[in-house]
């Protein structure tokens, strides 16, 4: 797996202060010819871009997430769910074990129905699902944590427990 960046102090992707891992690569099935119009991270579309995820990278992320002011670890892309999920599951398990009380968020261009049965979802707390659609772009407070109005913020734990899609509470226009 290749990564583009680790943002160790972000307030843009989730409530509070987050550590964000940007992975490289996405498959063309979610976007027009693999090139989403208006893509926020065009360089992240190529699997060959960036640097290798290594044990040192994992250590760097864990040390960043351990900081007392960090609330959340966020997976962004590219497309996190088009990566080696075993590597990501291992990373998330380590975060859950070593960094208690940290939420895990995942941004994906897939719909909930496409990803709910993936093993990695057992370790994710919140998923922002759905492809970015340029014509529905909305970065206002009314569309918090999403890039376009079609995207939804899913409470993954409750959704898996109740075996139905449960939207994260407190997010306007989220159903």
What do these predicted regions represent?
Residues 121, 126-175:
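Classical nucleotidyltransferase
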Residues 77, 108-110, 130-132:
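Short secondary-structure boundary segments
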Residues 45-60, 82-121, 126:
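Canonical radical SAM enzyme core domain
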Residues 69-94, 143, 157:
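Conserved glycine-rich "GG(E/T)P / GGGxP" loop and the immediately following alpha-helix
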Residues 1-3:
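Extreme N-terminal starter segment of soluble prokaryotic enzymes
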Residues 34, 68, 122:
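Structured loop/turn residues at beta-strand edges in well-structured enzyme cores
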């Amino acid at each position: 797996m290749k990564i583009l960046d680790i943002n160790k102090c972000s307030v843009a992707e989730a409530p509070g202060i987050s550590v964000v891992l940007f992975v490289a690569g996405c498959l063309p099935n979610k976007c027009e010819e693999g090139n989403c119009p208006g893509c926020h991270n065009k360089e992240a579309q190529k699997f060959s871009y960036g640097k290798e995820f290594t044990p040192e990278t994992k250590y760097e992320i864990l040390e960043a997430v351990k900081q007392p002011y960090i609330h959340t670890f966020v997976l962004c892309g590219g497309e996190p769910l088009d990566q080696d999920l075993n590597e990501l599951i291992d990373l998330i398990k380590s975060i859950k074990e070593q960094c208690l009380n940290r939420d895990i968020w995942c941004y994906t261009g897939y719909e909930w129905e496409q990803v709910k049965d993936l093993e990695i979802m057992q370790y994710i707390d919140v998923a922002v699902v759905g492809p970015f659609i340029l014509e529905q772009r909305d970065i206002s407070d009314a569309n918090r944590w999403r890039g376009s109005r079609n995207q939804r913020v899913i409470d993954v734990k409750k959704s898996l427990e109740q075996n139905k899609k449960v939207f994260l509470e407190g997010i306007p226009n989220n159903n």
